[in-house]
Every structure is written in C-alpha cells, then in structure tokens.
C-alpha cells in the first residue's frame, strides 16, 4: 500500500497548469491562428494591397517587471509586432498606338487583351514590423497584472459545438424529435420532426424552412438526397402537407420533388428576408455567408470532431464550416431515431457534451473581435484617404485591438479581481469553472438540471465545492486530478484492470466522460491486496451513467485515489466522509476566507495535500537550483549553485493583498544548509514549514457554558488574545491626488490653515506622514491645500492681486485624513510625480499613496470556524482561570455547543478533535486520506480509539482514555473548581479566524451626510450612513402605539430639514425641542405627482376673524409658511383659452 500511495502523490498535476498551459497555447498557436486568418486587404481600385504575416509575429520584452507594474499601477504587458507589407500597383492606361495593335490581335486571347489594356507595375516594399497592440502577459503564478491589480481569468464551461438530438413532449402529450447543430461562431441550425410528422429546419431559432427545400437550396440534387437518406420516402411523405398548403402558394407547384435549386433558394431567402426582393445570386450569397463562409461560420476543431464522431463521417478536421453532407446525415440520423428507434439521444448536461474554455481561447476570441474592427478601419481608410499619402504607420491603428483587450480584462464577467485572502483562496480561484458569462447561462434563468450533479462529474468537477445562493451549481471547481485536453473536455486518470488485477506498472490512462461511458469503473476506495488484485465479491462500479455492482473480473478501470473526486480546498478536510455534504461545502468555502495569522501553525490532523497546495499556490519560495545557502536575511536568500554562481531570491515583505490581508515571506533555511531543487526556502502567508497553515490547533470542549454558546456562539479564553494566537495583520491603502484646478494647482504642504502643531507632528517637511508613525482616526496622512473660488472678491481686490501677485490667496484644507474606526502603523509611503517619470492621469500633478498596517487581535464579534462547516461568532472572552480545565489543570481554549453536531451531521469534527488530542500528547501529526472504509469497517473510530489509548499509556494519564465513554473525560469548572456532572468531549481542533471581522462591520452615526433629493441620511458603513427604519420597524412601533417616537423618527431624525436645525439649536441652548414640520420626502412625492399632471396640493382648515372656517392651501415649498386661498380643484377653461392652449 505504501508504494501505491507514493505513486499517487506523483500523479497529482500542477494545480495551476490549466491557466499556464492555456496561455502557452495562445502564444504558440492561438494568436498565430487568428493573425493568419487576417485577410489581404485591397482598396476599391486594387491599386493598394496590405498583407500581414501572422506566423512571424514578435513580442517585445515587457516594459515593467511584475513588481514595478504593481507598484506603479501599470499593466504587465508586452507589445505585439507583426510583419506587414504594403504593395502599390501603378496602372498605366493604354495609348492610341496600343489601341491599334489590340484591334489587329486575336480577341479570343483573354491574356493578350488584358496585358495590352493595362500595364501594371508593382512597386514591392520590404516587410516592416508594425505595432498592433498590447498583450497582458501571465505571471508565473497564473495571474495577470492589469492597472496594478492582480486579476484571474476563470475557466468557462459551455455547450460544446456539435450536434445534439433530443426528444420532447408537446402540450398535447405528443412526441417531438429535434436536433440542434451548434456552431462555435455563426448561425445555429435546428432540425425537428413535429407531431404531424413534418420535418423542418429552423435557422437561428426563428425562421422555419421545409427540410427538402433546404437540402435543394444548398445544392443537393434529388439523386444525392436519395443516396444520402436511408428513409427518403419518409422525407417526401413528411413534406406532403407542406406541398399541398404552402408550396402551391409560393411557386405554384404541388409536387415537392419538382422544385428546382433556384426555386428552393428563393423560397429560403424569402423566409429569412421576407420584405426584400429575392434574386438567385443574392440568395446564394446569403446562404453561403451564413453556413459556408469561414469568416462568418466556424464549427471549430471540436465541433468538427463531435459531428464526425456522432454521424460517422470522415470529413477532415481542418474543414471547419458546414458541408451539405453534414446536413444530409443529420436529417438521416433524426429520421432513424423517429422511425427505427435507432441512434442515441444526447444529454446536454453530460460532460462529454460540455467543454471548458480557458484563458487562451477566451483571449483568442477577443483578439478576433479586435482584428475585425481593425480590418473595418483599414478598409475605410483606404476608401477615404489619398492612396499616395497612405503608409503602414497611418493605415494600421493599434487602438481597436488595445481597446478590445482592455475591455475583456477590465469588464468581462470572466475576468475577476483575484481572491488573495490566503493561498487556498488564490488556488481555488484559478481552478474555478463557471457556467456564466458570454455564451453561457444566466443565473436568473438557469434551471435545476443545469445546476445539479451529474454522474459524469465524477473525478472531473467537485461535487462539494460550489457557492451558496443564486450561483449554486453554476460555479464549480476542478477536481484534484482532473485536466483539460486539447479539445477542452475534462479528463481524469484511471488505472486499467485486467481480470481483477490492477495494473500499477504503467502511468494511468486519462479518459473523458464520453470514453468512460462504455467501461465499468470502480471508485478509488476499493480494497486491493498485495498482489494488486481487487478484494471482495461484489464491487460498486459506474457504467453508462448508472451506479451498479459487478464482480472484480468485469471491472475495466479503477480510480487512482479516493480524493480524485473532490477539489483542492475540499481535499484539505480530514474525515470528510463523516460530514454531511452541505456542511462540507461550507467548510470548503470558509477555508478560503481564513485570515493569514501572525503566527501560523500547521494542522496536527491533515490530509497529505497541504504541501502540494502551498507550493502550487505560489505563496512559498521554491529553489530552482541545488546548492548551498550562502546568505539569508529577512529580505533575500542567496543560494550558491554547483557552478559557483549565486542565485538571489527576493522575499515579499509586508505586501498588501487584494483583500487587505498581509503577505509576508519568512526564510526557513540557514546559512550553510545544503539545498536540492524544489526545496522550500521561505514560508509565505498562511504557510508553516512549506505546508498550508490557515489556523491554529487549540483545545476545545463540547459543552454548554452559561448560555454563552447558544446558537453556535463560541466562548474563548483570554490566552488566545494575550498570546497573539489569532492575531492577524491587515494593510489598508489610502491615496490622494494633487490636481491642476481652474484656480491653480493643489499643493502638498505642511502649511495647512487652522490646524494645530500637534496635528502636524507626524508629517515631514513636505507634508507627508513619516514611515513608521502611529496614526489614529482623523490624523492627517498627507497635507494638501486647494485654491478657493474668488467669486465673492471685489473688482479692486482682483486688480491689486493681478498687479502685485498672489500674496495671501484663500485656500481650503483638503488633506488626506485617516477615516473613522481606523488606526495603525504607517508601513510604506509612495510618491508618484511626473518628474520621476511616473505615468499619471491627465490633470494630476502628483499622487501619494500611504499604507497603514493594523494588528488585529481576536475579539467579541469576530467569526471563527472549523474545517467541517462548524462556524460561529465569539460571544465572550473569559479569563484563563474561569475556563473549564482538565484533570492536569490545563484550561481549554474554546467552548463549543454540543448541539451543533447531531443536527448538522458533521461528525468529522469530533474525530478530528479527538485524534488531534492524541497527536498533541504523542507529539505526532497524522495525514488522513478520506474514505478509509477500505481498510475495514469503522476504520476512523478504531484509529482514534487506538491513538487515544497510546497517548494515555505514554503519558501515564489514564483520564485521557476512558473505556466507559471513549473520547470523553472529566472536566472541572474554573470558577468553583467543582467537576461538571457529566464527562465532556475534549479535543484539539484546528480552528480558523475568518475575514468577517467585527472591526470592519461595527458602525455608528451621530451626524453625517444626507441624500441630496430626499434629504434622508445615507445608508451603509462606507458612506457613514444611518440605521434604516423600514416598514417592518414602523409596524412594530405602531403595534405599541408609540406615536411620538414614530413622528420623531420619520421627521426630525430623518428628513425634516427645518426641524432638524431647530432641534439642534434647542439641544445646544437647553430649550424644549419644537414640534416637527413636513418631511422632505413628502415634498418630493408632491412634486412627482404634480409632474405627472395631477393637480394636488395640501390644504388646512383655518378659522377667520369673522368666525368662518375655510380651507387654505399650504405652500410647502416656501420657508415662510404663508397661506394661500384655496383654489377650485377643477377649473374650467373658457373655449378661447382652451383653443389657445391647444394651438
């Protein structure tokens, strides 16, 4: 078994190869293919011809390194140059003498005629390299740097081009057979047999044409159709109804077999373009451009392969447009399904019918769009510009291609801001597979069938890892051992089995979902003996999408490992088989949210993939050479190789990630140490000795404690705070621009008006905060002043200023200050100016960026979780002496609610914590591969009990393992010293601190900004907004009859502007708060109704001096609150006025 496991570890591919291989394909083949397809362009007079030589394209070395691109907000890209040739053809018209010569010549010779009429002199120019655009280059970690931020292009899973047959039932319960011919680019064709038995062809889902008419239109004669169809009579009989009803109207014939090619073409054209006059050449051209023109229609290599395979054709894979044979064979297959019940229907959710488009293909499609735009611009320039003045430089404009690529990387749904919270998040993001995006599904319309698990997902797409919510099932993750082949289909490895014996001698065989269908495949947790024979009489296998059983001799293949079914993040969960799938899903997703800790610790209980994931994520530094360490510091490591050369490795120190977490690399080698190729030299964020370390091993107790762990809340010890067990560093970025305004430039300065010296204590002489300073909320980071407007200045003042210069101009303080609820240490200050050669936006003279690091200890309100979906919020931090303690006096670190286990069915956490306890006492770490039942029934329980017994014997502490209740022990109350009534489950669990920190969420507002229109307080923490009082809250107050509280909340505390100011004055002066007035939102409602033409106003009853009560209109818009005499609601216009109103 040891040999088999070591073999399997070698079989895990590089987990980021899907990104790197795809981009490599794009550079070697994809870009060449799309450039080669660029046509030779001539002007209308054929005097000028442009030719691109795509195969010889060159890429210039990137202008900036990866580090420079990140720090300067640039794109890490290379310039693409393509050799191009512009050929001019000077055409001389024939002279009179030449005309005489022509008449005496034999006019039948076209060649002589042509050569005499025109004399063409070609001016040949040398090929010149022309710049056509920038291409963002992938970093060695599989990411792109675009405008200084790290982005990832996620993989898209879409319907594969090809032909798919399906059977539906219409509203009357009758069967409809149809076939969809999907192209990579161009129109879709659908063949269908309706309930009446008629065969139709739909073009782009709308236009319906009779199948026989369409076959004639594409150039097939009657004999060819007869030969190509095994059931020709079925086609003719199916068209009888059409012949009688419609054919007579269209061309005046009753027999469909009498239709000529030209008539068929005109019928098809009239269906597609009903309002345009039809002619045969136009119809022919239209049909050609729709299905047979390589520029507009493309099946792709995959589509051609799938159609050939389905219909049994031998058309070359380079022929990527439709052929008449394809259409004829498609109809023949459809008739056979309907008439003979032969042939197979297709399942569109089967992974054999869905393919993955990775970064290379997505980029290729975007380049194709950009080159099409470029072609159109070149043609326009050739038509408009003077031919003699045209040259390569002003003919080929790189802007369309640059814009197309920028649009893709900047705004495509598949180009995403990389999740850099920790290495697992980073790796998972690169291996993500999305069914959304252009050409994919819409999450609002995607049904259950698309999202559901499919048997073909086994070993290809993880059944566990997917988001919760609207994207569930539409976004998945590639399984650990899966890879994508050249056609984009996902493959997974299997060992062949011969007569019940597994062949481990050769490399495993990779199979796609289609190829796997015809074999009996056993899972990876089937027991195999020393001679490599499968043990057991009945073996569970997958065969033709079904889960069945068979005998060992009939097994064709066996999976290489139990973990090949699941993704990289899920494979980090020990005892996964004991967890409910929903909780495992949460565990996988929450590992990606774990914050890198200041002191990371590798787990006692792992799965064996921790090192592999840490290495492939690119977070740790790997040695490229063998040799000896000759230099180590916090910033770099020097390795002297066998040739005596020193290779330096620079380490990342306190870098800010995309999610504001801290990336810091620490050396783990020492001077004089011998190094081999591939050895880990330095740890990064969330790694410990080259292994993933997302959290800490802490002592847990499953017991209730004074109700503080109600509803999954956690009770933790002060030790976790004081010993910085869960302390993390977060780095925030603050930036300010110094702009050129109409009134003059803004200035970065220490001389800020109306600011005390104490506020300037951390600024240098230029007004920028000194690196290393401690700053709190409201402190000035960068001093900046902006010129004020001079509208209120007298003319003589302006004249004096113009004469004597700007001595005492008015300025406004616009300094960059640290926002509310933030504090920390300034770790870096970067100044960008044009003088230094930095590229800045137009109108900006300088930009200053300040990085502030914050040390966050764990506190009440922070979210923690285990690896099994057991998440909760910290409800209280207890002193160490009050925590429950063990028999040897050790206080526990965290108290969890035992009620969180049975209903959630994530028992894996209990196995993990008990084995972790044994590991802690034995000073051992365990690697547990999931699905261990092949080693015997209840293997997990047996292992845990055995190791607890060993720990009990080794430490001579009998209380560690109790036969009466294994895994439980007596625990004492820290406050009283009394033992608790019942034994408690105690263990050492691996707990994570998640990125949902209370510091980022807690928020309060006294005064703050208001909305311009409604004058209500803004919402949200970022806007320093207020707490929303919604309709349900109003109902609650109404239920208690709290009328005055409601009035206050809806007016003074919300949008009654006048009452707001009056209330503030009253509070300041100690007077009673006046009555509220009309809310601003009511006035907005009135104006909206009036804008709709409704005569609406507010009236009140008023008692006049003569004792009469009359309604008076209230003018809400004026502050004076004057009353106006009420108008009649319905004023009748006189006839003259009415006519004047109309005209």
From Swiss-Prot:
GO terms for biological process: DNA-templated transcription. CDD domains: RNA_pol_B_RPB2. This is DNA-directed RNA polymerase subunit beta. Its EC number is 2.7.7.6. Belongs to the RNA polymerase beta chain family. The gene is rpoB. It comes from Porphyra purpurea. PANTHER family: DNA-DIRECTED RNA POLYMERASE I SUBUNIT 2. The keyword Heme does not apply.
